[in-house]
């Protein structure tokens, strides 16, 4: 499958480096997620006043909304070092033990995709999170013995796109659980303007708003679209991103005014044309459009549900009248 310009996942190492260069250093520079920021400000200040490690934090929500960035900002606000890893990277208990024993007092351990930790790894985390200790088994067979090692106070920040896959015992050990929401058009416009300033790209307010409007409520997509529109401005314009140029560029990139691309439209058209608008099961949809179920659940559904183009029911997915109107298809409600 071709790379999607509106994918909310990072696509390569270059984009990871690009995102790193744009990251804010503190909560005051972090745009959006105001409720989360306000609460974290209080929790961080309280922990600092008590000279304690911040409670463990779980951040969940669709990809591209700034979970990793927020983890970095939390560490910066705490004046702490941060060590980063991911669920798939921790394959054996020894991998986690090595990371935990390398922590210094007050450090932040960030685990992305924490829902992908195995149960064996989770069980090692329980005492580490609750009591700052690590139980390890030395030897094998009848001579094996358990040794408890003390760990320094630390903060675990877990990030996940699928909080429902976390086991209850692990989820319950997080003192702070925050859901990151899609961004508003105004917030994304502010992000586009900030990024354009960092990139030394000329852009007017209407140009920034046009990019924001098509960014699916996701900063990562907004920044990626800005980079591509900037190319059009330099090659086919005078170097300035205007509303007119942004519209032309994004149309050529096949991103419509609501942020849908050809894959989104294919999904909606398939449900409408092949299944009379639904309800239809997700596995059937996936087979019909040649996508994996998990890809649809993580990458397409959240935004289509958010803007009211899709409904999730016990019987399956249904395309809404709003989506019909957007696609220019006559909507006939079944009696």
Swiss-Prot record:
Annotated GO CC locations: cytoplasm; Holliday junction resolvase complex
A GO BP entry: DNA repair
EC number: 3.6.4.-
InterPro entries: AAA+_ATPase, AAA_lid_4, DNA_helicase_Holl-junc_RuvB, P-loop_NTPase, RuvB-like_N, RuvB_C, WH-like_DNA-bd_sf, WH_DNA-bd_sf
Region (Small ATPAse domain (RuvB-S)): 184-254
Function according to Swiss-Prot or TrEMBL: The RuvA-RuvB-RuvC complex processes Holliday junction (HJ) DNA during genetic recombination and DNA repair, while the RuvA-RuvB complex plays an important role in the rescue of blocked DNA replication forks via replication fork reversal (RFR). RuvA specifically binds to HJ cruciform DNA, conferring on it an open structure. The RuvB hexamer acts as an ATP-dependent pump, pulling dsDNA into and through the RuvAB complex. RuvB forms 2 homohexamers on either side of HJ DNA bound by 1 or 2 RuvA tetramers; 4 subunits per hexamer contact DNA at a time.
Domain observations: Has 3 domains, the large (RuvB-L) and small ATPase (RuvB-S) domains and the C-terminal head (RuvB-H) domain. The head domain binds DNA, while the ATPase domains jointly bind ATP, ADP or are empty depending on the state of the subunit in the translocation cycle. During a single DNA translocation step the structure of each domain remains the same, but their relative positions change.
The protein, known as: Holliday junction branch migration complex subunit RuvB
Name of the gene encoding the protein in the UniProt record: ruvB
């Amino acid at each position: 499958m071709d790379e999607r310009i509106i994918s909310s996942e990072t696509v390569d190492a270059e984009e990871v480096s690009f995102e790193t260069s744009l990251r804010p250093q503190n909560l005051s520079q972090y745009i959006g997620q105001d409720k989360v920021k306000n609460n974290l400000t209080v929790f961080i200040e309280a922990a600092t006043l008590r000279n304690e490690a911040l409670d463990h934090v779980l951040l969940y929500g669709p990809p591209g909304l700034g979970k990793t960035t927020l983890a970095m900002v939390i560490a910066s606000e705490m004046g702490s070092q941060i060590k980063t890893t991911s669920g798939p990277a921790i394959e054996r208990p020894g991998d986690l033990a090595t990371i935990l024993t390398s922590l210094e007092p007050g450090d932040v351990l960030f685990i992305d995709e924490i829902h992908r930790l195995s149960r064996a790894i989770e069980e090692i985390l329980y005492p580490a999170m609750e009591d700052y200790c690590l139980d390890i088994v030395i030897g094998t067979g009848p001579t094996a013995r358990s040794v408890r090692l003390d760990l320094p106070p630390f903060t675990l920040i877990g990030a996940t796109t699928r909080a429902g896959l976390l086991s209850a015992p692990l989820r319950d050990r997080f003192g702070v659980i925050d859901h990151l929401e899609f961004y508003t058009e105004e917030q994304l416009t502010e992000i586009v303007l900030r990024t354009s300033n960092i990139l030394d790209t000329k852009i007017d307010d209407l140009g920034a708003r046009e990019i924001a409007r098509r960014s699916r409520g996701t900063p990562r997509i907004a920044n990626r679209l800005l980079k591509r529109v900037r190319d059009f401005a330099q090659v086919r314009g005078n170097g300035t991103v205007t509303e007119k140029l942004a519209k032309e560029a994004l149309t050529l990139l096949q991103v419509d005014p609501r942020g849908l691309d050809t894959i989104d439209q294919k999904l909606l058209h398939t449900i409408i044309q092949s299944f009379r608008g639904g309800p239809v099961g997700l596995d059937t949809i996936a087979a019909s459009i040649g996508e994996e179920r998990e890809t649809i659940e993580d990458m397409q559904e959240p935004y289509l549900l958010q803007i009211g183009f899709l409904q999730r029911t016990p019987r399956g997915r249904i395309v809404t009248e709003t989506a019909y109107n957007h696609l220019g298809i006559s909507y006939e409600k079944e009696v």
